[in-house]
């Protein structure tokens, strides 16, 4: 198999934080579905994480570690709805999730992230559906089910119901 490493921004946001490895940025480690991710700061830490069966996570917004590690595969799972700089020359195989990428031009393959029949479909030519700007319809609600903060800032945990339940 392949060793997996994650690069992340310094202040990641996730809609479902307990289902995101990005929490390792804040907590040092994160576990999702039995996969343990550990924040690392050096190549030695990276090797230690791999030897422990963990996924190492670098805080690396510029992607410098991609050039240093020379991976066999790069997967852009930022879900920014646009390409923030991922290129086919970053690795022998490049994959991107969601809109903003064209398979064969920007990356080798694009994976559809829009709800519906094509969710998860891999495109080797062409692109995922464009971003509609409207959240998916769940129970008849779209934009109404998304809460937007009135200002920038950090929201500290008061209570974590997911951890209380175990």
For the regions a protein language model found, what residue spans apply to each?
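Well-ordered secondary-structure scaffolds
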Residues: 1-166
């Amino acid at each position: 198999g392949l060793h997996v490493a994650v690069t992340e921004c310094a202040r990641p946001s996730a809609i479902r934080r307990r289902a995101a490895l990005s929490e390792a940025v804040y907590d040092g480690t994160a576990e999702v579905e039995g996969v343990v991710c550990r924040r690392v700061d050096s190549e030695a830490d990276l090797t230690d994480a791999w030897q422990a069966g963990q996924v190492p996570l670098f805080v690396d917004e510029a992607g410098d570690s991609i050039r240093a590690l020379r991976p066999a595969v790069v997967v852009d799972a930022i879900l920014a709805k646009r390409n923030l700089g991922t290129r086919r020359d970053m690795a022998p195989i490049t994959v991107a999730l969601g809109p903003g990428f064209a398979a064969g031009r920007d990356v080798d393959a694009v994976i559809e992230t829009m709800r519906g029949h094509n969710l998860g479909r891999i495109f080797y030519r062409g692109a995922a559906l464009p971003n509609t700007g409207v959240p998916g319809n769940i129970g008849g609600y779209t934009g109404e089910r998304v809460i937007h903060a009135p200002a920038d800032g950090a929201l500290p945990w008061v209570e974590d119901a997911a951890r209380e339940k175990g």
